[in-house]
Amino acid sequence: MRVKRGLSGHRRHKKYLTAAKGFRGGRSRLYRTAREAVERSLQYAYVGRKLRKRDFRTLWILRINAGARLSGLSYSRFMHGLKLAGIELNRKVLADLAVYKKDDFAKIVDMAKAALGK
């Protein structure tokens, strides 16, 4: 008996067409273009997840640098001072302190300065 593949093919098409919901034009209606659009979108999503880490690290460094320069230290000198002082706060926490808790961040900068002065 021959095997007919109507059901499995329909399910495969439906999977891509539901994933392409909201896309413009034929990208949401035509199977082939929808499949290409969905596969490309998944590639962009994969790359975006890698770029997001890079972008956030850049943002944190910018914020730390701005906060440190208010107290007269460059970013690199500040980070070196933290290492010498034995303060192990990551960049995300330091950036949050620099933006939302300026007084606490200034105290940390002073501790880094003191460690550099030794």
Swiss-Prot record:
GO terms for cellular component: ribonucleoprotein complex; ribosome. GO terms for biological process: ribosomal large subunit assembly; translation. Keywords: Ribonucleoprotein, Ribosomal protein, RNA-binding, rRNA-binding. It comes from the Bacteria. One of its GO terms (molecular function) is rRNA binding. SUPFAM superfamilies: Ribosomal protein L20. Gene3D superfamilies: 6.10.160.10, Ribosomal protein L20. Binds directly to 23S ribosomal RNA and is necessary for the in vitro assembly process of the 50S ribosomal subunit. It is not involved in the protein synthesizing functions of that subunit. Belongs to the bacterial ribosomal protein bL20 family. This is Large ribosomal subunit protein bL20. It comes from Desulfovibrio desulfuricans (strain ATCC 27774 / DSM 6949 / MB).
